[in-house]
Amino acid sequence: MSLRKRDSEMTEKIADMGMSRRLLGEYVCDLYKLRAYYLTKEADKFEKVLRHMLKAEKYCPDDRESFLETYFHTFLIKGNRKYADWILEAIRKTGNQKFIRYSEESYAVMLDKRSDLIDKMEEDINSKLYYGFALGVVLFMVAKQHSYLGDDRNALEYMRSAKACFHPKAVYMPVVDRYLEEAEA
């Protein structure tokens, strides 16, 4: 409720309560605080909690990767190099080579506007290296590169394929839907 009202003070108070931390866990409580500060644009508090979460070793590995993945791609979409850099550094520390690889390539496409990774990414797609969200991201990145090169036909095809891989609430869906609406109009 306090998140919907964008009441970061109440969210912080509830998330820091001992009972909340025991019932929901450290990760969920920290995530609520991070989200509240993000929504209320309290940059200093957001950065403090983000840095804490990036350093924290107490979260289970699946939660940690999910958090890193979601926020990393959120900041790629928004073009926020500062936070993407922080999170990419944490991703590299996971040791998960597939996760690291597609994250670094996504960074190169989204923030550095590279368009020379198509062949490499298509090899990964064809070798079935990725599935689910990760496959959707790779397909999206190939579409972006084709778009940078002015190849709208291939960009559209890859964007359609990316959409099929994403959950309807995935961070990329609004971008994909907007692209498809504009391309098909």
Predicted regions and their residues:
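Structural signature of alpha-solenoid helical repeat scaffolds
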Residues: 21, 58-61, 130, 168-171
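Alpha-helical repeat scaffolds
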Residues: 9-18, 43-56, 80-95, 114-130, ...
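"A position-specific structural signal for the A-helix of alpha-solenoid helical repeats
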Residues: 27-35, 66-74, 100-108, 134-144, ...
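Structured, soluble extracytoplasmic/luminal domains of envelope-associated proteins
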Residues: 38-79
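Structural motif corresponding to the intra-repeat A-B loop/turn of tetratricopeptide repeats
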Residues: 5, 40, 74, 78, ...
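Terminal, low-structured helical/coil segments at or just beyond the last alpha-helical repeat
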Residues: 154-159, 168-185
